[in-house]
Amino acid sequence: MGILSITDQPPLVQAIFNRDVEEVRSLLNQKENINVLDQERRTPLHTAAYIGDVAILELLILSGANVNAKDTVWLTPLHRAAASRNEKALHLLLKHSADVNARDKYWQTPLHVAAANRATKCVEAIIPLLSTVNVADRTGRTALHHAVHSGHLEMVNLLLNKGASLSTCDKKDRQPIHWAAFLGHLEVLKLLVARGADVMCKDKKGYTLLHTAAASGQIEVVRHLLRLGVEIDEPNSFGNTALHIACYMGQDAVANELVNYGANVNQPNEKGFTPLHFAAVSTNGALCLELLVNNGADVNFQSKEGKSPLHMAAIHGRFTRSQILIQNGSEIDCADKYGNTPLHVAARYGHELLISTLMTNGADTARRGIHDMFPLHLAVLFGFSDCCRKLLSSGQLYSIVSSLSNEHVLSAGFDINTPDNLGRTCLHAAASGGNVECLNLLLSSGADLRRRDKFGRTPLHYAAANGSYQCTVTLVTAGASINEADCKGCTPLHYAAASDTYRRAETHSGNSHDTDEEPLKESRMKEAFFCLEFLLDNGADPSLRDKQGYTAVHYAAAYGNRQNLELLLEMSFNCLEDVESTIPVSPLHLAAYNGHCEALKTLAETLVNLDVRDHKGRTALYLATERGSTECVEVLTSHGASALVKERKRKWTPLHAAAANGNTDSLHLLIDSGERADITDVMDIHGQTPLMLAIMNGHVDCVHLLLEKGSTADAADKRGRTALHRGAVTGCEDCLAALLDHDAFVLCRDFKGRTPIHFASACGHLEILRTLLQAALSTDPLDSVVDYSGYSPMHWASYSGHEDCLELLLEHNPFAYLEGNPFTPLHCAVINNQDSTAEMLVEALGAKIVNSRDAKGRTPLHAAAFADNIHGLQLLLRHQAEVDTTDKLGRTPLMMASENGHTAAVEFLLYQAKANITVLDVNKNTALHLACSKGHEKCALLILGETQDLGLINASNSALQMPLHIAARNGLATVVQALLSRGATVLAVDEEGHTPALACAPNKDVADCLALILSTMKPFPPKDAISSFSFNLLKNCGIAAKTAACGALPNGSTCPYSKDRHNAIGLDGCYSE
């Protein structure tokens, strides 16, 4: 917002500024626009309110000026009058219904503005019209916050007298008194304290009044707070005390006051830093540091990372402060948790003068730091040649010759070729840093240029990787091996080919601009190119492969260095072979995968065949499409790459990949390549077209594009499912609408006869279902829409529990309930525990449906019992479901629950529904027989708990087996005990002549043997029983009739001791539906 010239304003505004009432009246009589707006949407009334001329203001209002007009920042004339302290103008505006609660863009009301601008009279006029004086602006500040911020004692007093809250916090939890302390408004602070303000209040980050006063150097406020007895060492959320803050901000007077009042000079914060650490690092902390040292601060106190105050001074090269610390006993070679001493830190940040001071005071230049590096490693790594020279001391080596060795030893006391823990010497670091002056200093000091690190890399590898031309030339000239491979088989040429990627990130000053980056980047690329060119000119072999089979051409392609790639292709004798080779991956694939369109263009212009495939059958075009690189797709298609080549696993083409990933632009390019008329309908291994994949992944733009380009909307995959089926599953309304707009057939069926309406119902997509039903009416209103198993959409909605879809289907065609499979929607709902849809069906269609039967004669109550659905059972019985109804096998819901071991359902049917436990099925099994046959002990005990009837306990089925036989055979000890205690007979024999005791035998032969043994034991059973028992035994005994086959049971099964013994009681397995 600039300053506007008065001469550029409308005549009415000029007259107002000139306070010329008659001119204003004259202009208004001439029909001058009274609500004319300037560039910031301010009206003449804003101007009059700002000037405060009541006569003009009233004239404008009476002439129809909008009293609540807002400018671009939503300020009204009332805001303007309050800001200018024009109380008469404000009174007049209020008299003419100006909105006293109007807010500007910062949510500030006229009260906020008046309080901030010391307009006491205006505030007195506004307050009676407000419900509260504690209304907050967007930052959470009240009028009292603004008044305190302005330091106006009279305004503060007025607001307090009118009920302003002392403890109201803004959005950073700062109270008005925080601002008084921070801005040094001592009298205001005293008033607030006298009115009861909390002098120990904290904001959201834990800052107290003492912290804020210390930060801004408000010495008088600090003294007053200390006199009030505030806690001097109270930490904020970061553990910093007021002394920490004062030292960090360089407020030496405040720091002095705090120290004199007894502040702890050695109190650490959350990271272990003391005030001395802060004083050592801050811009203006020199006097604070001296004060702390003179008052007993521990100069060797280490933070949680092991940094001493001397480390902190070394970061920013605080020379004078480092001298003070050293003179006061700071440990020169104190190491942090990484092993770095202050000398390492000074070398890392290039502070030569500080290095001199540290070395003069005995700092160990051979001390190992991070990764076992010397300070010299760090100095040369970051390219500080002056520091390098200083650390090399005299810069000259002398030889110590003995009978055992002939080593170069530095005068500083360490071997210059000593490696770090990764095997890298100082020369490696210098080569990586790229400062040729450092490199020359080390070489002249005897550094070994052939030394390899743990990765097998020489300094030349590092120089090449960083694209450092001068360092590369220096090392090669000095005799470095140009084709030496590292542990991965990479030569310096491999790294040079990808040098722009491997280049170490350099530090820039904080005020660097983006405009400086482009020339710098261009300069680096040129240097990297010259480096590569130099290596090639000096014998580097471009045909050498690393251990994975990649040449320098592969590296250049993978990292997108077009100039490097062109140079390598030009210099390589077998370049075409390298480019076309797909072992392990071709350069074309690498460039496409990484989205390097310039490199890709170079390769495309070199190659004849762009459709070479990798081991998975993917072409470069497929990879570019899959990765969403439209530029690469454009390059490849313009050079003739095919969009129809399929990869091996799913048989996807680039079109499939583009559609599945939603890469619309790439898809457009592929279609426009015009390889085939039906290119959009190409199918994968499952028969899916790109349209189907686009819809499955909800890519609407791709769907529209494919349909516009001729993709067949009704194309079906190998399971007969179309794009419309997929749209119904995903629920994408836009995709579905696009398909219907292109005449997709709504009632198309898959291999199971299911339509998209079935899928929408099953997935619960209400709006999709509504759209499909409407479309189906116009297609074939008589189609019953049942699948090949007879299930309708209503079956699926009920089974899946989608109430809204079921409601729509019932509204659409309530008679659909009776169509299709007799296993009704109600059966489906209760068997899947969908009580809400079950209740909806009963309420909509009446109680008559609760006793409907499926093909096996089973009612919904059978289904609920099978699923152990108690709520379903309750619902059905509430609507007169028949509790003892039987299916075609003669089984009741209780029998169904017993057979499947559903204890809760059995308990409910027995105790609540009073189900009949004596009902027999077609094989004369009771519920007790069925529970025992499947080993459901709890169910059997529940049934036994309801009866003492010997007729039921000793009831035999068509195989003459009692519950005791079956319980014994299945090892149900507690059930056997319960049966025996209720009088179950132990001598009854089944069809095979076996008693319950013999039923415990693992197989028939064992049972027969056990029977023979028992027959010879005393006491004997009654004579009749013996003869009957012996007859049956001999008839079936394996000894007496080895070749006799076991007779069939009444239900057609074989011997009850066969592998599937449960068939002896005529069960038909689990509930098949």
From Swiss-Prot:
| Keyword Glycoprotein belongs to the record | no
**What keywords is this UniProt entry annotated with?**
ANK repeat, Repeat
Give the ANK repeat ranges.
7-36, 40-69, 73-102, 106-135, 139-168, 172-201, 205-234, 238-267, 271-301, 305-334, 338-367, 371-400, 422-451, 455-484, 488-544, 548-578, 583-612, 616-645, 650-679, 686-715, 719-748, 752-781, 789-818, 821-851, 856-885, 889-919, 923-952, 959-988
GO process annotations (BP)? protein localization to ciliary inversin compartment
Q: Which GO terms describe its cellular component?
A: cilium
SMART domains per record:
ANK (SM00248)
Which InterPro entries does the UniProt record give?
A: Ankyrin_rpt (IPR002110), Ankyrin_rpt-contain_sf (IPR036770)
UniProt keyword Repeat present? yes
Q: Which PANTHER family match?
A: ANKYRIN REPEAT AND PROTEIN KINASE DOMAIN-CONTAINING PROTEIN (PTHR24198), SERINE_THREONINE-PROTEIN PHOSPHATASE 6 REGULATORY ANKYRIN REPEAT SUBUNIT A (PTHR24198:SF192)
Subunit info?
A: Protein phosphatase 6 (PP6) holoenzyme is proposed to be a heterotrimeric complex formed by the catalytic subunit, a SAPS domain-containing subunit (PP6R) and an ankyrin repeat-domain containing regulatory subunit (ARS).
* Protein function: Putative regulatory subunit of protein phosphatase 6 (PP6) that may be involved in the recognition of phosphoprotein substrates.
Q: What is this protein called?
A: Serine/threonine-protein phosphatase 6 regulatory ankyrin repeat subunit C
UniProt organism field: Gallus gallus (Chicken)
What gene codes for this chain? ANKRD52
